[in-house]
Structure formats: C-alpha cells, structure tokens
Amino acid sequence: MQRLISVMCGLILATGLVLAGAGPAAAQATLQGSWTATKAEHDGKPADDVVGHRLTFTGDRFEIRSKDGSTVVYTGTFRTDQNAKPASIDFVNTEGTDKGKTWRGIYAFDGDTLTTCDNAPDVAKARPTAFEAKSGSGHILVTFARAP
C-alpha cells in the first residue's frame, strides 16, 4: 500500500512539473484546431462583420476564413510567448492584402473560450497590454468558441 501511495505521489509531482514547465509547444498545442468568433469589438465599436469568422491553427500556421467558410481571408504563421504577461501572440501574414504584416497581440483561455486582442489591421499601433479595444486604440478584441 505504501508503495502505491509513493507511486501516486510521484505521478502527481511529475504531472505538476510537466505542467509548470509547459512552454511554447504546450501553448501552441492548446491553440490547435478551429475557433469561431462569437463577439468582436474594434476601436471602441462592435465589429459584427468579424463574428462568425473561423480561426484555425494547424502546427505553426493560422488561417482565418469567412463566415460561410468559402473564402480564406488571412493566412500565415503564428508564434506565442507564454512568459509575457499577458501571454502574447504574433500573427505573421504570408499571403493576401496583409502579406508581410505582423499583427501583435495578446491572448487568454477560459475553458473552450479563446480571447485575443491585437493591433490588426493597423500594425503601426502598439501591442495591446489589456483585453480592451477602446476608441482610438486601433485594437480589435475578439472572443472565440472552440469549434466542434
């Protein structure tokens, strides 16, 4: 019995150490899959045209599709920094009208909800430091639900 308790304690400790040491790969793994925009605000105003768009992460790539899924709106690579507070994400556009531009943002998870705030489309604006898109900020705040 004491051996079982020792093994269980060891497993719990090992799990905690793995989670505590979770770095960029773990953050990237959590993002993987598709997310549907459920709410959006840009520069202090509702951004209803964004609601319904689907953001998909595959490996180190991202893709944003139109509401009906027929059009790729943006695509490129992304990188995260879990050590930044709040955690940061950069979307590097590799095709389309924003090719060569990098949107700098922040992100957070709450269960199957992903919240991002970034400086798209005005890349001259600074990376957001809070989850808000106040008038004049040039920031866009989007809430996503994990797609089934």
Please provide the spans of the model-predicted regions.
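Positively charged n-region of N-terminal signal peptides that target proteins for export
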Residues: M1-L4
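Bacterial N-terminal signal peptides
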Residues: V7-A20
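N-terminal helix-cap/turn-to-beta initiation motif at the start of protein domains
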Residues: A20-T36
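Contiguous, well-ordered beta-strand patches that form the walls/edges
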Residues: A37-D48, R61-A133
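Short Gly/aromatic-enriched secondary-structure transition segments
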Residues: V50-H53
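C-terminal partner/receptor-binding element of secreted or periplasmic proteins
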Residues: S135-P148
